[in-house]
Amino acid sequence: MIIERLVGNLRDLNPLDFNVDHVDLEWFETRKKIARFKTRQGKDIAIRLKDAPKLGLSQGDILFKEEKEIIAVNILDSEVIHIQAKSVAEVAKICYEIGNRHAALYYGESQFEFKTPFEKPTLALLEKLGVQNRVLSSKLDSKERLTVSMPHSEPNFKVSLASDFKVVMK
């Protein structure tokens, strides 16, 4: 089965009205536009998203829906650094330092709380900066993602030369 577009999200439906099968994804797999996965019930699916969400697949995104059958995304819990800022200045410092490392940054559960995937160097940096943090297991859902940039990604557009293209040497 080839999935080329999203059909909706489980939060907009009553999941009890459907037979829901899930594709379990790690947080870093949610940004893939082309991939192969197996659902919990053993169905092979290929994803080739034409208009992939800019931030990636989110928890509950519906990949397939036919009558009462649904295949939806489940983002697995992973080891995450939960960061609690004490002030707006500390928020700026956190965003700068995490962004400087090109690490993913997500909104947390409350104001001034953020999440980033666990990496020892990031944890050491936060400790050095005196930023309150703790390592927990939780979901990193794309809809909560702050950073949009994606290193080493392929562009989502085609490049072609215009018929009137000219190179001028001066």
Curated annotation (Swiss-Prot):
Keyword annotations of the record: Chaperone, Cytoplasm, Nickel, Nickel insertion
GO molecular function: nickel cation binding; unfolded protein binding
Keyword Isomerase tagged: no
SMART domains xrefs: UreE_N
One biological process term in Gene Ontology: protein-containing complex assembly
Main location (coarse class): cytoplasm
Gene Ontology cellular component annotations, sorted alphabetically: cytoplasm
Cell compartment(s), UniProt: Cytoplasm
InterPro entries noted in UniProt: UreE, UreE_C_dom, UreE_N, UreE_N_sf
Role of this protein: Involved in urease metallocenter assembly. Binds nickel. Probably functions as a nickel donor during metallocenter assembly.
Similarity-based family: Belongs to the UreE family.
Protein name: Urease accessory protein UreE
Naturally occurring in which organism (per UniProt): Helicobacter pylori (strain HPAG1)
Classification lineage: Bacteria, Pseudomonadati, Campylobacterota, Epsilonproteobacteria, Campylobacterales
The gene coding this protein: ureE
